[in-house]
Amino acid sequence: MVKIAFNTPTAVQKEEARQDVEALLSRTVRTQILTGKELRVATQEKEGSSGRCMLTLLGLSFILAGLIVGGACIYKYFMPKSTIYRGEMCFFDSEDPANSLRGGEPNFLPVTEEADIREDDNIAIIDVPVPSFSDSDPAAIIHDFEKGMTAYLDLLLGNCYLMPLNTSIVMPPKNLVELFGKLASGRYLPQTYVVREDLVAVEEIRDVSNLGIFIYQLCNNRKSFRLRRRDLLLGFNKRAIDKCWKIRHFPNEFIVETKICQE
Ligand SMILES: *[C@@H]1O[C@H](CO)[C@@H](O)[C@H](O)[C@H]1NC(C)=O
């Protein structure tokens, strides 16, 4: 200000010009700063909205993942692990009169099974359909390794027959799964021999509710009988036993012919 007082007109003009330039410069700078700010604000808004979008997506995927895991848990809880296996094995029946003929082709009989094997429950539920070439009865068989029981439901008679599980005949579920795997892959020679069981229905069982849920479901509301091996029967009226039938199945790498007789 003091300087201005001594300024010549040219100096004043110069000063004005300088001020003009400064004003211009400062305006430009301000505009630049403003533009920068606006830009920054604009980019921030953009980042903000995409961030919100990401969060929403993340949240949604968490909810979805939760639903999937929850659903899987509920499914696993309510639907026990089980797989249905199908298999066929053939056997040579030396007692079949057709096979005792000399020079005749050996007559192999097929046995087909459908098995629901539940390793978690230690149980095998075997369905024997109506056989096409033999006199065996269709049946549903339960081998319950937890309860140590076998139940035969003869589907022609509608009766249940129960006996202790014979672990030297029946393979554990894990090995049965392997056997069916081998049968399915065709790597296994499905020709085998027969083991015969001769059983007698000795007494009626009125209450099957203490034999496990699986046997209960199979045999509840049906006539149920306890089976005994004929060779272990002492003092039993053997002549009174007249009706017999067979169930052929494979609880192992061989066929078991279960003959059940009843008065
Ligand atoms: C299991 O079955 C086999 C073959 O039939 C027999 O030799 C064995 O005595 C049976 N075991 C029991 C406990 O019945």
Curated annotation (Swiss-Prot):
Keyword Membrane: yes
Sorted UniProt keywords: Disulfide bond, Glycoprotein, Membrane, Signal-anchor, Transmembrane, Transmembrane helix
SMART domains: BRICHOS (SM01039)
InterPro entries to which the protein is assigned, alphabetical: BRICHOS_dom, ITM2
Residue spans crossing the bilayer: 54-74
Main location: membrane
Disulfide bond sites: 160-219
Taxonomic superkingdom: Eukaryota
PANTHER family: INTEGRAL MEMBRANE PROTEIN 2A, INTEGRAL TRANSMEMBRANE PROTEIN 2
Name of this protein: Integral membrane protein 2A
Species for this entry: Homo sapiens (Human)
UniProt gene name: ITM2A
